[in-house]
Amino acid sequence: VQPDLVTMENVPQLLDHPVFEEFLANLEGYAIQWSVVQAVAIGIPQTRKRLVLLASKLGDSGLGLPTDTVKRKTVRDVIGRLRPIAAGEADPKDRLHAAPRLSATNLQRIQHSTPGGTWRDWPEELQAACHKKSSGATYPSVYGRMSWDAASPTITTQCFGYGNGRFGHPEQDRAISLREAAILQTFPPTYK
C-alpha cells in the first residue's frame, strides 16, 4: 500500500528505537516532516509530549508542524467553572461529572496533598509502605494533586483513580471526574 499521505503519532521514545529508522526507510519517495510536539504548546492543557510525523507523496504538505503559537491553557482555564462535587458525588445535570469514592485513608491523604504535590507532602503515618522503600522504586508521581495554574499531567485511562497518578483535583478532595478528564483532553463540555 502506497497512500498519498501518511500520518503518525506516538511516544517520543520511539525516536530512540530502531523501528523508527526502519519506518522512515519505508517512506522512500515521501516528503517527510516529524517533530516532538508539546501538547500545551498547541492549546491542549496537558504536559503530554507526542512524536508527530507527516509524510506526503504529493510533495511538501505545506501543513507544517505546530509551534508554540497559542496561549497556554491551565487546569483552571478549562475545568475551573465546573460545579464543585465531593468524592462519591455526581452532578445531577451531568452524569459524567461524577467523582469516585475515596477510602477514609485516601481522603486523609488528599487532604494533606498540596496543589502540584504528591504523597511526599503527607505525614509519615499516611505514606504507603512501598513509598518508604530505599530501593528507589517509590513512584513519585502517584497520589498527586493537580495545580490550578499549570497544565495537567498526561491524562491516562486510569485518571479517575486518585492513586494512579497526579489526578487529584486541585482544590476539591477527590480525583478528577470523567467530565474533567475529557475536557482536559479537549473534548467539548457537552460531549456525551
Task: Write out the residue ranges for each language-model feature.
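Class I S-adenosyl-L-methionine
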Residues: 1-142
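C-terminal target-recognition/interaction regions appended to catalytic cores
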Residues: 98-192
